[in-house]
């Protein structure tokens, strides 16, 4: 049995990780999700399994593997494997509604949100919240399943033509539109439950088309990336979110509401990749920290690194 298997869907996003694993001499196997088949009674594929599933995979494969992966991770955890970003954090990644409830549990503010499972309920939800509103699919990625509506007439037309987003799980969120101060969103990256770094994406507050890594911003030159230091209160809060969700590696995003200066949290991403050009932006390569973490987990799992 290999020490490590990386369960993944998007090889381009994982290229820096794969290169680092080879550079450090890991005994590992890539495990593509697209055509994956598993036997629930069989042993796990490795002592340690690293889940790298992206929610945006629903855009790249009609017969997506989201719930297949959830079942596989649960089976492997039950069979004794150490699964990094296992079934518990994946269940949060699979539900924006659960993410918002988690943020509130920690005492964080979010955009005001109502959750339903029928398209016909959306207009009444929007009227309750007040325009403009954002309608979101419960499961999405890279901005998929997100639309802004500025009036009741516009929304009613979209509902009547079934043009409003709704999740692959039939759950939909209607959310207050929050104007991001200076058009900036901030992504906090965590590793092993600890704050690792944060980046500001300037210009991202006007778009929904963000993916798990700023490497995707190559075609969005209006968005710039820089390292930032959030307040200690926010660092502590995201650590608590990570702890409650069982998140080993991932990102949590927030923005500052330009109307009142309040930090509002809106996204939990267990597939958040590290910043591109890390030495230029951060002054260090977080893949080194990740490799150290993986070595430690392999050792704890009883394998040889």
Please give the residue ranges for each predicted region:
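Short glycine-rich anion-binding loops that position phosphate/pyrophosphate groups of nucleotides
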Residues: 54-57, 139-140, 271
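Active-site nucleotide/adenylate-binding loops and adjacent lid/helix of ATP-dependent enzymes
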Residues: 5, 76-79, 87-183, 232, ...
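Short hydrophobic segments within beta-strands
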Residues: 6-7, 191
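Phosphate-binding site of ATP-dependent enzymes
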Residues: 148-244
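Conserved N-proximal alpha/beta basic substrate-recognition cap immediately N-terminal to
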Residues: 9-112
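Protein kinase-like catalytic core scaffold
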Residues: 133, 196-197, 250, 264-266
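Glycine-rich phosphate/pyrophosphate-binding beta-alpha loops
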Residues: 142, 269-281
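A long amphipathic alpha-helix within ATP-dependent nucleotide-binding catalytic cores
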Residues: 209-263, 286-303
């Amino acid at each position: 049995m290999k020490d490590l298997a990386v369960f993944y869907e998007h090889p381009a996003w994982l290229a820096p990780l794969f290169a680092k694993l080879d550079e450090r001499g890991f005994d590992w196997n890539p495990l593509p999700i697209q055509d994956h088949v598993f036997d629930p009674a069989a042993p796990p594929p490795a002592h340690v399994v690293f889940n790298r599933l992206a929610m945006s995979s629903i855009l790249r494969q009609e017969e997506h593997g989201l719930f297949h992966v959830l079942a596989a991770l649960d089976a492997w955890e039950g069979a004794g494997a150490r699964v990094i970003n296992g079934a518990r954090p994946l269940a949060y990644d699979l539900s924006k509604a659960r993410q918002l409830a988690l943020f509130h549990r920690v005492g964080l503010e979010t955009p005001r949100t109502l959750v339903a499972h029928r398209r016909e309920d959306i207009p009444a939800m929007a009227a309750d919240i007040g325009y403009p509103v954002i309608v979101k699919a419960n499961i999405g990625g890279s901005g998929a399943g997100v639309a802004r509506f500025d009036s009741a007439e516009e929304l009613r037309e979209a509902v009547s033509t079934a043009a409003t987003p709704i999740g692959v799980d039939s759950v939909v969120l209607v959310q207050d539109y929050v104007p991001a101060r200076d058009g900036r969103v901030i992504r906090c990256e965590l590793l092993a439950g600890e704050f690792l770094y944060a980046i500001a994406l300037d210009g991202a507050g006007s778009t929904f088309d963000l993916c798990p890594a700023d490497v995707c911003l190559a075609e969005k030159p209006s968005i710039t990336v820089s390292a930032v230091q959030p307040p200690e209160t926010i660092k502590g809060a995201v650590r608590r979110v990570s702890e409650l969700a069982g998140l080993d590696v991932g990102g949590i995003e927030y923005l500052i509401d330009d109307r009142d200066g309040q930090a509002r949290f809106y996204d939990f991403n267990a597939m958040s990749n590290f910043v591109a050009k890390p030495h230029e932006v951060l002054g260090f390569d977080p893949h080194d920290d990740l490799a150290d973490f993986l070595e430690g987990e392999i050792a704890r799992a009883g394998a040889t690194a």
